[in-house]
Amino acid sequence: MSTETVDLRYPIGNYESQPYSEKQKREWLNDLKYFPQLIENAVLNLNEGQLNTPYRSGGWTVHQLVHHVADSHMNAYMRFKLGLTEDNPTIKPYEEKLWAEMADTKNLPINISLTLLHALHARMYEIVSNISEKEFERTVVHPEHGRTMSLWFLLGMYAWHGKHHVAHITSLRERNNW
């Protein structure tokens, strides 16, 4: 795999968890809170041809990315709720590549997922912003990754995930002068 491909896949680098701090918590919470507006701005004024352009060779189209983030963050919302209400629950993985090929992703306009993201992130922010430092230590089990993850880890991962996909779109726009 070439360096260019790696950079295009991970334009902001890989996710790296950070130790708990109030400063980091505020930063990640702001990432969650403002993500819907960031992705909406990233796709603003793109035409159908641009929306159907893969962000890299072999990658998803912008259209698929927007729907993927909605799918992923719906799962995140449920994972936080499960982690807060159950003792170390095993979360349900999903086949994101297959989900990206389903009828809703292929046929519905992105404004459906953009609207969903605004509502979803308002709810997720309300839950996560009220988690105590002790509650952030609660865990979920991800069977596909074979590991136990704290809610703190999940907060950082989903804050990163949103920025990661916004960067896919904005870097594509920059490369193509859109």
Name what the model sees in each region.
Residues N30-A42, A100-E137:
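Acidic/histidine-rich alpha-helical segments that form the ligand environment
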Residues A42, L46-G49, D87, I131-K134, ...:
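A short secondary-structure junction motif
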Residues E22, W28-L29, S113-L114, H164, ...:
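Short leucine-rich amphipathic alpha-helices used at interfaces
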Residues Y20, W99-I112, E144-F153:
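Acidic/His metal-coordination segments adjacent to aromatic residues that form catalytic metal sites
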Residues R26, N30-K33, H63, H67, ...:
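A generic "alpha-helical surface" signal
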Residues Y20-R56:
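Short, contiguous, helix-prone interaction/anchoring segments in small proteins
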Residues L29, K33, N45, R56-H63, ...:
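Alpha-helix initiation and capping sites
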Residues M1-E16, N52-K97, Y125, E137-W178:
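Short, contiguous alpha-helical
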